[in-house]
């Protein structure tokens, strides 16, 4: 069963999802809700929806992957949740089944989750009192993993599960989570070949055959990914620092810079 999230769902995508028996749409805005109602009515179907709320909680992660603060593009401001849920209940072709929340990615603390889930629990009670049948809670994901310091200890799945049970377990809802990164974040390796070693005026470059189109996170927001040589260098060899870059004709096509002072590779 598929849950359809995202702030920019198109009419065509909605039609395909409804035709395929989608589990639910996580609706992000009133215009999206109105379009989905129109599409569902035209197809003679009822679209199951959760409505994503924005709790204005700082996930304490990189700003580029924060999704639950008021300045972020995601969800309905929680202060307007009752109004929007009432609007959804009046639209034909929609069946409101729950609440969706997602505050960010690569979270390394449980506290932000706790704050957001407490708000979800309270909102669930309020919406039920308003007559809405809230049976599902999509709590998002974002549980962090270790990228750099092997001594880092992000929350474990067991600790996260205990928090979920504590904050929303008493509500009797179906719980949906999106573990994503925690499952697959360390499952892949990008292997690239050094094409050229280049000396600039104030730095050295290792130019790879891999680029930001293969792994965009470092170029996009400075994400850290460990870089190791496929073949270990010989002992007692001179080392220098290098910028590890790709061949794309943009200066942002960089995997690591001299700010990663541990990144030393052998001279040729």
PLM feature spans:
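Flexible glycine/acidic-rich beta-alpha junction loops that bind and position SAM and/or redox cofactors
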Residues: 57-61, 134-151, 176-177, 181-188, ...
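Acidic, glycine-rich loop-and-beta core segments that form the ion-binding/anion-interacting portion
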Residues: 116-172
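A short, hydrophobic C-terminal helix/tail in secreted or cell-surface proteins
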Residues: 264-268
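Charged (often Lys/Glu-rich) extended helix/loop segments that serve as interaction or gating elements
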Residues: 163, 171-263
